[in-house]
From Swiss-Prot:
UniProt-recorded name of the protein: Protein Smf
Its job: May help load RecA onto ssDNA.
Family: Belongs to the DprA/Smf family.
SUPFAM superfamilies, A to Z: MCP/YpsA-like, RuvA domain 2-like
InterPro entries the record matches: DprA, DprA_WH, RuvA_2-like, WH-like_DNA-bd_sf
Recorded superkingdom: Bacteria
Gene3D superfamilies noted in UniProt: 3.40.50.450, Winged helix-like DNA-binding domain superfamily/Winged helix DNA-binding domain
GO biological process per UniProt: DNA-mediated transformation
One Pfam short name: DprA_WH
Length: 398
């Protein structure tokens, strides 16, 4: 049965311009989103990232939406979902800078898993793996579940499907994170695997029923895979693989990143080899991996924790104690000129990034693009050397 705070989380998730980053700030500032919903404009203005124009838009949308009526209507098609006030909302996921405000699910929730007491490991990779990549994915997945880990992946073809199916084959626990609504199986050939995970594991999505596989959904989905995981394994990935986005998020969220090596002659190995070159741990064997994962500190199991938005979480990912790389003072250095043939969408995103750190949600609001499209675009702009990422999911021009 839904509580009143759940109604306000759901309502705020419908307000355009207020994405996951700003919504978390609201929750931390007001403690209850009911308080934020009823707050006067001057009080909203006290929250970082809420300017005069945005507040005007928020007030207009707020006046046209009844949270409890919307909740009742929404539950007719989406009966099972979590919001961060729920004790089964994943503890690790709340600690990332952009936790999904609504998490729809099929299958069986595990409270100890939600509290981080049963560790999850993300396994990702290309949709077109070699025999080497598939074979090692199956070996590693089964070794992990036999040691008590939960496997987290994205239900895509290739490495994802290998990870899920091999886990289930030995009666292991697996979580699939979708880039669509729970009513749409993508890719269609994974229907049987989808049904098996729904029966024996857990399927999650931040998208409501009816959401199609839009291009921008999948980079956003990847942050959830990284957020749920204590470590992320990239088993095989060519240079532009989406699995590398998951690895990037994992690094930002202070998760360990592991990568499976292969010959430089194999195109599918180039992304993995680049990760290793940049500091990812090498997967050499099942035992070596298990030993490395065993060195990751456990979450405090002595205190069961319901997520309270106003509290600073003390757990595996305490961002206040994580050393971060920051850029030095820019001075009068000229900005990098973008290439003349830069894609229109990337130009639009770049124009929304300021010389001072700009919040992700602000970029989303200015561009009016989906958060997944913006995240993917910012990653490309980083690779081109046009923007840099700062702590707190902020970006600035370079």
């Amino acid at each position: 049965m839904a509580n009143s705070e759940q109604a306000y989380w759901l309502a705020w998730s419908q307000v355009k311009g207020v994405g996951p980053v700003l919504l978390k700030r609201l929750a931390q500032h007001f403690e209850l989103l009911e308080n934020a919903w009823k707050a006067r404009p001057i009080a909203l203005g006290e929250v970082e990232g809420f300017g005069h124009k945005m507040i005007e838009k928020i007030i207009g949308q707020r006046n046209n939406l009844n949270p409890f009526q919307f909740l009742e209507e929404h539950q007719q098609k989406n009966p099972q979902f979590l919001t961060p006030d729920d004790p089964d909302y994943p503890r690790l996921l709340w600690e990332i800078p952009s936790p999904p405000p609504v998490l729809y699910y099929l299958g069986r929730l595990d409270h100890r898993e939600s509290q981080g007491q049963i560790p999850g490991v993300g396994i990702v990779g290309t949709r077109y793996p070699t025999d080497h990549g598939s074979r090692w994915t199956r070996k590693i997945s089964q070794a992990l579940v036999k040691s008590g880990f939960t496997i987290v992946s994205g239900l895509a073809a290739g490495i994802d499907a290998d990870a899920h199916s091999s886990c289930l084959r030995v009666n292991g626990r697996t979580i699939a994170v979708l880039g669509t609504g729970l009513d749409l199986i993508y890719p269609p050939q994974n229907r049987q695997l989808f049904e098996q995970i729904a029966a024996e594991g857990l399927i999650l999505s931040e998208y409501p029923v009816g959401s199609k596989p839009e291009r921008g959904n999948f980079p956003a989905r990847n942050r959830i895979i990284a957020g749920l995981s204590r470590a992320v394994l990239v088993m095989e990935a060519p240079p532009k693989s989406g699995a590398l986005i998951t690895a990037k998020y994992a690094n930002e969220f202070n998760r360990d990143v592991f990568s499976l090596p292969n010959s430089p002659d194999v195109q599918e190995a180039h992304g993995c080899l680049n990760l290793i070159h940049n500091g990812a741990e090498v997967i050499l064997s099942e035992n070596q991996l298990l030993a490395s994962l065993g060195a990751i500190p456990l979450l405090d199991q002595g205190q069961e924790q319901k997520i309270l938005p106003g509290d600073r979480q003390i757990g595996y990912l305490d961002q206040t104690n994580v050393p971060t790389l920051t850029t030095g003072a820019r001075g009068k250095q000229p900005l990098t000129e973008p290439p003349e043939d830069l894609e229109p969408t990337l130009k639009k995103i770049l124009a929304a990034v300021q010389e001072e750190p700009t919040a992700l949600d602000q970029i989303v609001a200015v561009t009016a693009l989906a958060i997944g499209d913006v995240s993917a675009g910012l990653l490309q702009l980083e690779i081109l050397g046009l923007v840099s990422q700062e702590p707190g999911m902020r970006y600035q021009r370079r």
